[in-house]
């Protein structure tokens, strides 16, 4: 007899709980994001080098999936290992590849152009166990797809952009970004660099970024979206 009445009671309790969550989501932008969105999925980081051949560089933590399934406000780090095998003291500078139409594809909805790179900021680059930030980028240039400083109201990114031309973001004038000044490496020396990225939470519901790498509706794929960058180590012999 008890089970006869217990099942309806549990069902009613669950229904009531789900109703409360739905009502809270409607009136809370941040909670609304987590209640109504899945996650952002995107590509990640790779690494290459230019200059002296006898060096090693590899991503040892993070990397390919660093931007996958991020949520607003979430921070993630990637660690790069660099070693000097040249037999001479060297210097290197860390750069990041420029945004392109291939690396920063767009999702268009109701005339608004959504680029995930405008939401992701490189907060810092730290060497080894140091707390010192070696990142030389400032302001809007810290975002993976930079806009004008004025477009980041209060330092927060927009949720969407509307371009008068109807052609989306103009990538033609962008070049790769230098992330650090020259870093010295003695013979045989090995160091690590840790880069911290943040999906900046601007307090708005960001529904355009649902399953960013495979934004689909039913069987019809609306867009195959992407966010990726290459870290570039420029090596040279120290004078």
Predicted regions and their residues:
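Residue-level detector of alpha-helical transmembrane segments in integral membrane proteins
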Residues: 1, 22, 139, 150-151, ...
């Amino acid at each position: 007899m008890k089970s006869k009445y217990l099942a309806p009671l549990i069902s009613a309790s669950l229904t009531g709980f789900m109703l409360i969550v739905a009502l809270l989501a409607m009136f809370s932008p941040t909670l609304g994001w987590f209640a109504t969105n899945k996650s952002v999925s995107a590509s990640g980081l790779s690494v290459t080098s230019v200059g002296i051949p006898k060096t090693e560089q590899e991503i040892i933590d993070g990397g390919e999936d660093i931007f996958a399934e991020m949520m607003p406000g979430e921070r993630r780090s990637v660690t790069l290992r660099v070693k000097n095998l040249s037999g001479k003291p060297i210097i290197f500078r860390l750069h990041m590849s420029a945004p392109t139409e291939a690396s920063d594809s767009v999702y268009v909805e109701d005339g608004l152009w959504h680029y995930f790179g405008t939401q992701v900021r490189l907060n810092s680059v730290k060497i080894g166990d140091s707390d010192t930030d070696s990142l030389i980028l400032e302001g809007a240039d810290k975002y993976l797809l930079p806009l004008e400083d004025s477009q980041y109201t209060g330092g927060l990114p927009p949720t969407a952009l509307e371009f008068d031309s109807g052609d989306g973001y103009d990538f033609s004038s962008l070049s790769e970004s230098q992330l650090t000044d020259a870093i010295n490496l003695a013979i045989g020396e090995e160091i690590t660099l840790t880069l911290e990225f943040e999906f900046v939470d601007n307090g708005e519901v960001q529904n355009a970024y649902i399953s960013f790498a495979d934004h689909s509706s039913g069987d019809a794929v609306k867009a195959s979206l992407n966010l990726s960058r290459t870290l570039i180590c420029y090596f040279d012999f120290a004078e």
